[in-house]
Amino acid sequence: MTTPIDETQVFPPAREAEIAALMVDAVDLHCHSGPAAMPRILDHLEATLDAEAAGFSALVFKDHYYLGSNHCAMMEKLMPDLKVRLFSGIALNNACGGINPHAVDHAIRLDGKIVWMPTLAAKNHIDQSAKATKNFPSASKPMLKAIPLTVLDANGALTDETKQVLDLIAEGDIILAGGHLHVSEQVKLFEEAIARGVRKMLVNHPTYVIECSDEDIRSFASMGVHMEHSICMFVDGRGYKWGGDRLAELIGLAGIDRTVLSSDLGLTGSPRPVEGFRRVLNTLLDQQFTHAQIRTMISTNGLHLLNLA
């Protein structure tokens, strides 16, 4: 019988113990807790307490419209005994002025750890949203129509603002994430990022919205870019897309050392982030990944990207 998505899935005792041990020191680089403009099933405090109880090392709050670093600072001050480290970043959508170097500079000064290129306001995302096959989460109340954003100018070259953002990311030694830009944009983005000294790079859900081919994934990994696969797409719930066999294939394309698994959870109709981790760990164990391989993908790689290891 399938476990309801809002409940904790129960595994045999030996598997439960195995999963619990693997969860210790996990890192979630993509937690969609609230408050948010779109409905969320838990808030930042609840996500923090869940992660703390499971023994996570770090949690990164992602919102499409605001930098969450102030929430992190206040929660850490109010709960000084927390072991899980709390971080956030900024998504360069219309709410922060788009591809805005001033917003990025501010985010870095507030200890932001990730700069996501445009997500919901990316031209690619808007184009994909027009397709009947897509079912993106929407805001609880109508918002202003998004102004489509791209990192490329009319001649197909990176814009000056994008280059300035890359320089700031390199100087801050934080993570550049491709957001919802199309793969064709991300190729140029990461090539320029490397040339400008960016060392930590991430492609978010490469096979969803981004339209990466298997060869694109191999190519990005060879450049030193990590592939971040969204757990929500491999566990039961609203975001489910593929089973364990496909996840194993995708991991094989980039390799263990260039793969990160993050929840991308908090959306309605799906498990909570920590529960998503539990379920995907069960899948990885069923796929015969070793404990060392799993820890690399859910902990070690994320700690390195956050400069915690």
Q: What residue spans do the PLM features occupy?
A:
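Active-site beta-loop-alpha junctions enriched in small/polar residues
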Residues: 30-34, 64-66, 89-95, 118-122, ...
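Short acidic/histidine-rich active-site segments
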Residues: 256-273
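Mid-to-C-terminal alpha-helical segments outside catalytic/metal-binding sites
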Residues: 276-309
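An N-terminally biased module of ancient metal coordination in phosphate/nucleic-acid-related enzymes
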Residues: 1-84
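Extended substrate/RNA-proximal surfaces in nucleic-acid metabolism proteins
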Residues: 83, 94-203
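Acidic (Asp/Glu)-rich catalytic clusters
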Residues: 20, 72-83, 105-111, 167-169, ...
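Catalytic pocket-lining loop regions of alpha/beta-barrel enzymes
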Residues: 167, 172-241, 260
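Divalent metal-dependent hydrolysis catalytic cores, especially in the metallo-beta-lactamase
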Residues: 28, 46-70, 83-93, 112-120, ...
